[in-house]
Regions:
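C-terminal helix-loop subdomains that flank or include functional centers
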Residues: 11, 16, 38-39, 92-107, ...
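Structured, contiguous alpha/beta core segments that scaffold functional sites
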Residues: 1-266, 291, 376-406
């Protein structure tokens, strides 16, 4: 395969991203002198990652969406041994295809973008798939390559890699042919990167985190009131004032709330006193936290019962199954198709086999099934072996006298 050579030039001083001067492509340089910024300062993925590690409800929704979209594994037809092998071993690192899909689903839920590297050779004798952390990937200015770097806040061109966007392959120094798939959620006015669906609720995620932090602060303060300590004392210097304040702090040692010490000239008598600051708005904080959680669920297009967020009326298996069915048809199945469709194309292009039978096994979070379902249908829904021609599996679940747990 011919090598792709591209010249480089120095980036403008105001560009925070260093010009890309190196590549793993044999004898070639990086496809662009810089990348399209992901966010105003090219650090938006870092900010989104930080929020996801601080907001409890936000993180739970992200985790659950990825779990449901990745399903219980992947299956294919019996006449596809190469695809079956890829399902079990997607790469040389021991990842299954389900592992890869789960990471892609998580990245797309968190960033609105996901990246999948495809590796083969000139003879197409093998296929390996590698997930790449989306926060380490940027679109090159030629819009035909993805630049990978481990730390975009301290870019070093010698550590950068360049991979062409699918369907273009480029030969690497190890003799392999590689390309990369870029998944991105569509958003008007955004061409180079997708936008996470929950972006309108980023402030809500921050509110949920800050209300949790406020509760931690109250716990650290042993729920003691904050306030102002008025001290009557005559001081001749700043040092004397500091000494008196330290003595007061020692006297009120322990783990009190935040106390402001104020020294004033001593009048007749000792009028030193503590003026508490009452937090009579605890209910408002709770309401704010609840509203933030509700906004997050709405922005994620998700459902409370599927992420362990309780209703005021409690949980029920019927509600969980109902919300799962809605989520399956409105969120899970479309996301699965978005992730699997390019993978099927890669399999067909590289291995030359039909991958149309590749699909994800979906299973509801509870075992309850309608009694009009046949046994083979129930086993199929649970990802178990089934035989439509088996007379016993043609029976309805109702004939068993109870809801099947097969």
């Amino acid at each position: 395969m011919s090598e792709h050579r591209i010249a480089t030039r120095i980036a403008a001083p105001e560009n925070r991203v260093e010009p890309l001067l190196g590549s793993t492509v044999a004898g070639a340089s990086v496809a662009s002198d810089r990348v399209w910024h992901w966010g105003d300062d090219n650090m938006l993925p870092y900010a989104l990652s930080l929020i996801s590690r601080r907001s409890v409800a936000h993180r739970r929704i992200l985790n659950d969406k990825a779990d449901y979209i990745a399903g219980k594994g992947l299956v294919c037809g019996d006449n596809s041994p190469l695809v079956s092998h890829l399902i079990v071993s997607a790469n040389g690192e021991g990842d299954t295809l389900r592992d890869i899909v789960h990471r892609l689903a998580f990245d797309e839920a968190l960033f609105g973008n996901a990246f999948l590297e495809v590796v083969t050779d000139a003879e197409h004798s093998f296929l390996a798939l590698y997930h790449h952390d989306a926060s380490k990937c940027r679109v090159a200015r030629d819009s035909e390559h993805i630049i990978l770097h481990h730390n975009w806040s301290a870019f070093n061109s010698s550590d950068a890699r360049s991979l062409p966007l699918f369907p273009r392959f480029e030969e690497q120094t190890d003799g392999t042919l590689r390309t990369i798939l870029h998944y991105k959620d569509y958003e008007p006015m955004f061409q180079h990167y997708g936008v996470a669906g929950y972006l309108a609720a980023v402030d809500a995620a921050a509110i949920a985190y800050k209300t949790d932090k406020w509760n931690i602060s109250r716990l650290d303060n042993a729920f003691q009131l904050s306030g102002v300590m008025m001290l009557d004392s005559v001081v001749d210097s700043e040092a004397e004032a500091d000494r008196i304040v330290r003595m007061a702090e020692e006297k009120f040692a322990g783990n009190p709330g935040q106390v402001l010490f104020v020294l004033r000239d001593k009048a007749e008598g000792d009028n030193s006193r503590f003026i508490p600051i009452n937090t009579a708005t605890d209910g408002d904080w709770h309401t704010l936290h609840t509203q933030a959680e509700n906004d997050l669920i709405i922005a994620h297009s998700w459902f409370r019962s599927l992420s362990g967020l309780d209703y005021s009326s409690g949980f029920s298996s019927e509600r969980i199954l109902h919300e799962y069915e809605v989520a399956l048809n409105t969120v899970i199945l479309p996301e699965q198709e978005q992730l699997l469709s390019p993978i099927r194309k890669v399999i067909e292009l590289v291995l030359g086999v039909d991958a149309s039978s590749l699909e994800i096994v979906n299973r509801p979070p509870t075992r309850s099934k309608p009694q009009y379902m046949r046994i083979w249908e129930a086993r199929k829904a649970d990802g178990l072996d089934y035989d439509e021609s088996d007379p016993e599996q043609q029976q309805f679940l109702a004939s068993l006298g109870k809801t099947s747990n097969t």
